Regions:
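Intrinsically disordered, low-complexity proline/glycine-rich segments
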Residues: 1-128
Length: 128
């Protein structure tokens, strides 16, 4: 059986790691930050899932609330963006793999963005 199809308003979740510069002369440290972004960009203009634009590979999410520095300042300000990098191998929307619950997303991390995010979708439309 397939997985729920992703659409506008579904989420990408992850745990991101960012470098924080503590006050004074201490070296930067890594701090984990939760990522929870609503899928809201690069959606299909002509395919809807449950009345909302369908998500596909390369659809994006904005982390809300944005990451906040804990114990100092960010060495590099986070982008607070996620992008779906995997989808269905058999179902395509506008020529791109359809996104489903459980598909992988890349999210903002230091020193480089990493594929640690997962799509979380609910609904009545399932895609294999």
């Amino acid at each position: 059986m397939g997985m729920p199809a992703a659409k506008k308003g579904d989420t990408i979740t992850a745990t991101d790691v960012h470098f924080i510069q503590p006050p004074g002369t201490a070296p930067p440290t890594t701090v984990q930050h939760p990522f929870k972004g609503r899928i809201n960009g690069n959606l299909s203009a002509n395919v809807n899932i449950m009345g909302k634009p369908a998500a596909m590979m390369n659809s994006t999410a904005t982390n809300t609330p944005a990451h906040q520095p804990i114990g100092g300042t960010f060495v590099k300000p986070p982008a607070n963006r996620g992008s779906i990098i995997a989808g269905s191998p058999t179902v395509f929307i506008n020529g791109k793999p359809a996104a489903r619950s459980g598909d992988t997303a890349i999210t903002c991390n230091d020193p480089v963005d990493l594929p640690v995010g997962k799509v979380v979708a609910k609904g009545t439309v399932f895609i294999g």
